[in-house]
């Protein structure tokens, strides 16, 4: 047996940020040589859906100083961006307080550079397999082109599942003016400057669509609607200090009451409400795992939509684009449900049932869907995950948020060699969508994989 064949082989399915971060920490922290294979069809690792964005209007949603890989020095990405990124060519990135909100692709390049450095600096090897994982058989990942990758450890770092096409629009699924995937390159470019646009969904993706239209010089009307009509809030200027408070005791209702009471207390100290929410976020995984199953379901049913629009905020530049369109009368939002959709020639006729009561009819030239990932159907969204599920290796979590895992992020199933990294594990950990949490989780998964490999080696030695 060759030295390479005797080295443990870790297969990572998914090469976006989560997968690249796991690979990086495996390389950095392993005390023995490893073979790492990352199965990812995109041409480069570390970008994924979020950081593959090429539209200059799409910016990172938090200041660069808060974007980093776990284990990096504070502000590492901010310093890299100012020295090596596109900072000189992007004057709009910097705000009056000195903070910078780079275009999203910059962070993907930062991750890619760190990964390349780790490959050179450490003893492990990394192979990027530009395919999709398609099947699973007898401990092997089978790619779409038939490669068989025997895995001593498998890490699922899968991307967000695609949105589910709402039933009310399925009969126009092939209509050229229905934009079901606004992330597709050039998807919005064909919209004329004076076209009337409706956007189904009012959260982060909607904000990106409006920012793109604004950058293109769109002058037509834009209507964004969702059942509750809640828009993502903007980030505040960097605060001089953080809000210090613990939210790790009490029932869900008691914690909510404390958070609400702390917002005016923080304001009295000159801190915005965002500082309080950031304190909650930093304790989010602990809080989530302390809640009862009934409280988790209560949160998902009644509070999640409010948490999401306050927790997952938009860059000030994006907020400004929305504000400008609202000020000139070309943007409005509505709390409404799409009851019916008809087509007359090239015009969509929307029948909207308002949350406040009554019905509104709206004619638009384009309908854009930004309803978000369909996490409840994650396992069914990819053939590889379906194969793992059918083999008893993984199963959906009980809350419909992703894949069921244990406290070590191991998939609950027939094997002890499968881990889940990133948002697909949030049914267990809760707060696992923001980059700082995903980065730290990736490091923890890498450490657990390495510890497991070491334990097996000691047993067989």
Predicted segments — roles?
Residues 52-79, 240-255, 317-318:
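N-terminal glycine-rich dinucleotide-binding loop that anchors FAD/FMN and/or NAD(P) in oxidoreductases
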Residues 2-49, 92-250, 257-455, 461:
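Flavin (primarily FAD) cofactor-binding/catalytic cores of flavoenzymes
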Residues 74-81, 85, 415-420:
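Short coil-to-beta-strand
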Residues 55-71, 75, 85, 90-115:
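Dinucleotide-binding Rossmann-like beta1-alpha1 core, especially the glycine-rich loop
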